From Swiss-Prot:
It is an enzyme of class 7 (translocase). The keyword tRNA processing does not apply. It comes from Streptococcus pneumoniae serotype 4 (strain ATCC BAA-334 / TIGR4). Keywords: Amino-acid transport, ATP-binding, Cell membrane, Membrane, Nucleotide-binding, Translocase, Transport. This is Methionine import ATP-binding protein MetN. The keyword Lyase does not apply. Its main location: membrane. It is a peripheral membrane protein. It comes from the Bacteria. It catalyses: L-methionine(out) + ATP + H2O = L-methionine(in) + ADP + phosphate + H(+); D-methionine(out) + ATP + H2O = D-methionine(in) + ADP + phosphate + H(+). Coiled coil: none annotated. One of its GO terms (cellular component) is plasma membrane. Its EC number is 7.4.2.11. Pfam families: ABC_tran (PF00005), NIL (PF09383).
Amino acid sequence: MSRDIIKLDQIDVTFHQKKRTITAVKDVTIHIQEGDIYGIVGYSGAGKSTLVRVINLLQKPSAGKITIDDDVIFDGKVTLTAEQLRRKRQDIGMIFQHFNLMSQKTAEENVAFALKHSELSKEEKKAKVAKLLDLVGLADRAENYPSQLSGGQKQRVAIARALANDPKILISDESTSALDPKTTKQILALLQDLNQKLGLTVVLITHEMQIVKDIANRVAVMQDGHLIEEGSVLEIFSNPKQPLTQDFISTATGIDEAMVKIEKQEIVEHLSENSLLVQLKYAGASTDEPLLNELYKHYQVMANILYGNIEILDGTPVGELVVVLSGEKAALAGAQEAIRQAGVQLKVLKGVQ
């Protein structure tokens, strides 16, 4: 069983500006297990970046308790000496939207700068830098300056630099926001690869649920400084509870865009009185069941599929359908019950039940 490598308990962060007190984070508790890729999602101003900055005490909380790798580093106040905190911070790497590379130094020199206070010899440092650049796919770019690198390559240098002190945790704060979609996927694939190869715990801060869907195994949703929903990616995507979470997921799955087109179709605009427009969501074993065929066999209910999507989330197939069900009123009622009994979520979008 995995252990919690990050424990944030009842964290508050408040800022005082003249006569105003601003609460950026309010009573947030999050536990992240070793080896997780953990996404924290929210719109601008949700408090997600402020929250992750307390992990290494770049931002001191106003209240709460922080435990990192079994060491309590904050409990109402900082519990470490300055030297202990410096060493603990070496266990936590960070990458950002802006790469923060030194323009007058090569890729190799930028990574080596993170080893400035290391006890390694000059030769050992050089070998380590070469290994890190190879790990992020830049072995042939060691002597290039930032101006000679693409955005994705600059972020790879930043990742190599963040890994220089062998951290157990890597915080990615909107690290793909400035990148094009193709490069974003490449950087996410790299983070996933590092997670698997190094056993690295990755904390992703993002406003895009698509990023969480691509590589995370757990997700927390923040709004106005509060944690409003948390769970496995599979749980959250298959059964979101909060309206904001539902909005994020609709954007990530493309269902909203699809519904605009579906609603213009003749069969939907002029839905017959013996028909229902329904949305079906299913996960795991349910995706293997020939459910719609069974509806006709047992209830004489016809199913016209207008939209379908299936994805693999954290190793589990998750599907979504928009379907017109047609049949006698009693048969439609029986078919709906059969669908729910099969473990499939059903939502009537249009039609009289």
